[in-house]
């Protein structure tokens, strides 16, 4: 066999100095793509749909997004579209696929993978547990691929979850998606705790877990020879991120993850975002700086004794919304709910900012 797998039992990355979370920090929660929950009869609804109905709508909306193909290196291709971005290392040793789109996009994903050549998919790498990244695990495993992820991805996919989202209907109501435990065939067959290294197709690629950021299951994949980094939802390029506090996400962790990746990227690194266009070091730096600004503004309001409603009334993101809230399409002004991130549980602060 032409590839080898070297599992490195390196020490866990040091936790952030001081507090790793910030009570009252802002969760800039916008589910993607930009117009995901706009349009259709939902805009006239008085209440958000049921979690099951909302999930079906979400998958359908994601699946309506066209898929685009972009060559990143001789052996690396990015598919951008129905559920974010998929990165593929392809060569005589087989295909190594990072993330998998949403379930309804499987026929298109399969066609795109087949279009890269006849080599089989050897490994599927989940950057975290969310459905728009791991929905097609079972399909790919059925073709003979091994699904590889951080151990918390298996943990989270094995549990029921209610994932809070910002419903973008007429009333901007807070809603949630419900997930039952995933079937056994969709779960990763191989996991790691801290880091893992693969070598194939002339490439060395390192998988690295980070402290809780978007979730507690996040990893990034660094294709070292090609100078490509696939970040999953540790990076939303040009837009406010979605942070999942119910499974460990924190804005402080997102900042720390960006800092970690900036420390290994250079000015020529191609950075695949979980959502948004292909990025680079400058794009990631801008996103990191926006998160720092957002966190610090909310902390200042909290330290001044403002309640969540009072903080929202201050419109702390008025100058950020036109840049980060507009994303890639014209739409309503962004709305950002305030959350407490001092625990992994969602706090009861559902006030919305914006007009």
Predicted regions and their residues:
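N-terminal secretory signal peptides
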Residues: 1-14, 21, 29, 37-38
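C-terminal regulatory/interaction regions
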Residues: 3, 14-21, 308-355
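C-terminal segment of N-terminal export signals and the immediately downstream linker at the start
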Residues: 30-72
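Conserved beta-strand hairpin/beta-sheet module of binuclear metal-dependent hydrolase folds
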Residues: 68-113, 219-223, 227-232
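Active-site metal-binding motif and surrounding structural segment of the metallo-beta-lactamase
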Residues: 69, 92-93, 104-148
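Metallo-beta-lactamase
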Residues: 71, 94-95, 102-104, 154-210, 216, 225, ...
């Amino acid at each position: 066999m032409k590839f080898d797998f070297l599992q490195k039992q390196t020490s866990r990355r040091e936790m952030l100095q001081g507090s790793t979370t910030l009570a009252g920090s802002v969760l800039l929660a916008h589910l993607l793509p930009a117009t995901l929950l706009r349009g259709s009869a939902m805009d006239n609804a008085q209440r958000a749909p049921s979690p099951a109905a909302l999930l079906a709508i979400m998958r359908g909306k994601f699946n309506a997004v066209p898929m685009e193909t972009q060559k990143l290196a001789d052996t690396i291709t990015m598919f951008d579209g129905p559920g974010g971005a998929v990165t593929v290392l392809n060569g005589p040793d087989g295909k190594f696929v990072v993330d998998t789109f949403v379930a309804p996009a499987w026929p298109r994903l399969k066609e795109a993978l087949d279009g890269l050549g006849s080599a089989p998919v050897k490994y599927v790498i989940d950057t975290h547990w969310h459905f728009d990244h791991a929905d097609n695990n079972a399909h790919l495993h059925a073709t003979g691929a091994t699904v590889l992820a951080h151990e918390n991805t298996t943990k989270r996919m094995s549990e029921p979850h209610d994932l809070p989202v910002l419903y973008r209907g007429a009333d901007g109501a807070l809603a949630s998606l419900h997930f039952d435990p995933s079937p056994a065939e969709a779960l990763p067959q191989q996991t790691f705790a801290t880091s893992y290294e693969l070598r194939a197709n002339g490439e060395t690629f390192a998988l690295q877990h980070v402290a809780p950021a978007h979730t507690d299951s996040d990893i990034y994949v660094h294709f070292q020879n090609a100078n490509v980094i696939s970040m999953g939802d540790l990076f939303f390029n040009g837009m406010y991120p979605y942070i999942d506090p119910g499974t460990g996400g924190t804005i402080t962790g997102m900042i720390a993850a960006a800092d970690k990746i900036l420390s290994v990227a250079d000015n020529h690194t191609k950075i695949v975002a979980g959502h948004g266009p292909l990025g680079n070091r400058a794009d990631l730096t801008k996103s990191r700086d926006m998160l720092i600004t957002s966190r610090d503004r909310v902390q200042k309001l909290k330290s001044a004794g403002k309640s969540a409603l009072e903080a929202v009334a201050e419109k702390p993101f008025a100058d950020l919304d036109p840049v980060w809230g507009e994303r890639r399409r014209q739409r309503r002004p962004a709305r950002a709910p305030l959350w407490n991130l001092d625990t992994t549980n969602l706090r009861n602060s559902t006030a919305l900012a914006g007009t």
